[in-house]
């Protein structure tokens, strides 16, 4: 890859990082959490985030990678781009200032880094960039075919659902509106919301699927089996991702089981939308 092409890919990654982190830039609760969030939990978020970004680089890196080291470097580059762009944007809109304590500055940047890093990695696909030589290299064709096979595998689908769920839920979890909704809905409304979330996830996973993927999924078993293995498993991952983020942002403290369940159900609703759409974004080049 030439320097000009690499610079162009970095530019796309920068745009993707800002675009994906934009909701958090404009969220007042995020500004407060940068100061109040437990630093140990933010470190935990980074520890969980990094291997997921390395794995995501395999599916959607912003440059062509050929081995584990390349994917690791890709992930670190995405984190660096997301952190740098996040710091600049927060500084421009007055959320950061040199007078603030260093811990507060680091906390605010850390919160926007995860969605920004995802955006940096997905920018190549979102901006429809096609690298030169991808169609002319037979070895590249074999590699692409192998990657497509992996992307269609069961665990790859679950992984991509988890990434999408974490990204969307992270943009909602810090807000007070999410807590307010959970308090004002009844148990029956919570149950209805959970069922609607399951239905939405199932529709997103199977609606407008490519014919080969439909045949592959149906070949895995009956439609009930597919519903359990994909949709129910996906919703469970969305719920776990929601619980993890609620814990990261201190929403689980002094909270009863019933209230916590409602928090999870409410946060899982946007999470399932991200889970269902994540595979569509990564799988676009197969169309």
Each PLM stretch: what is its role?
Residues 1-2, 55-67, 125-128, 207-215, ...:
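C-terminal ends of transmembrane helices
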Residues 168-221:
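Transmembrane helical segments that form the transport core of multi-pass membrane transport proteins
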Residues 11-23, 78-87, 111-124, 152-175, ...:
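Alpha-helical transmembrane segments of multi-pass integral membrane proteins
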Residues 87-101, 165-181, 239-258:
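Alpha-helical transmembrane segments and their membrane-interface junctions
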Residues 36-49, 103-118, 184-200, 266:
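Alpha-helical transmembrane segments
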Residues 32-38, 60-74, 98-103, 182, ...:
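Interfacial helix-loop-helix linkers and transmembrane-helix boundary segments
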């Amino acid at each position: 890859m030439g320097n000009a092409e690499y610079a162009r890919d970095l530019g796309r990654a920068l745009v993707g990082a800002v675009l994906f982190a934009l909701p958090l830039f404009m969220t007042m609760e995020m500004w407060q959490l940068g100061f109040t969030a437990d630093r140990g939990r933010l470190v935990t978020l980074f520890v969980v985030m990094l291997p997921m970004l390395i794995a995501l680089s395999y599916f959607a890196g912003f440059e062509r990678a050929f081995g584990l080291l390349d994917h690791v470097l890709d992930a670190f580059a995405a984190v660096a781009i997301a952190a740098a762009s996040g710091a600049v944007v927060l500084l421009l809109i007055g959320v950061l200032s040199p007078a603030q304590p260093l811990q507060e500055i680091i906390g605010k940047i850390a919160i926007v880094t995860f969605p920004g890093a995802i955006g940096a990695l997905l920018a190549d696909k979102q901006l429809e960039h096609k690298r030169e030589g991808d169609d002319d290299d037979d070895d590249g064709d074999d590699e692409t075919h192998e990657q497509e096979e992996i992307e269609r595998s069961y665990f790859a689908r679950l992984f991509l659902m988890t990434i999408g769920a974490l990204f969307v839920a992270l943009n909602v979890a810090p807000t007070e509106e999410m807590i307010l909704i959970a308090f004002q809905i009844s148990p029956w409304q919570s149950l209805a919301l959970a069922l609607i979330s399951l239905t939405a996830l199932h529709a997103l996973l199977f609606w407008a699927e490519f014919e080969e993927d439909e045949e592959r999924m149906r070949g895995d078993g009956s439609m009930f089996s597919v519903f359990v293995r994909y949709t129910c498993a996906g919703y469970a991952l969305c719920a776990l991702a929601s619980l993890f983020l609620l814990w990261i942002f201190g929403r689980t403290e002094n909270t009863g089981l019933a209230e916590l369940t409602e928090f999870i159900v409410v946060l899982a609703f946007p999470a399932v939308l991200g889970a269902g759409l994540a595979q569509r974004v990564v799988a676009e080049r197969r169309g």
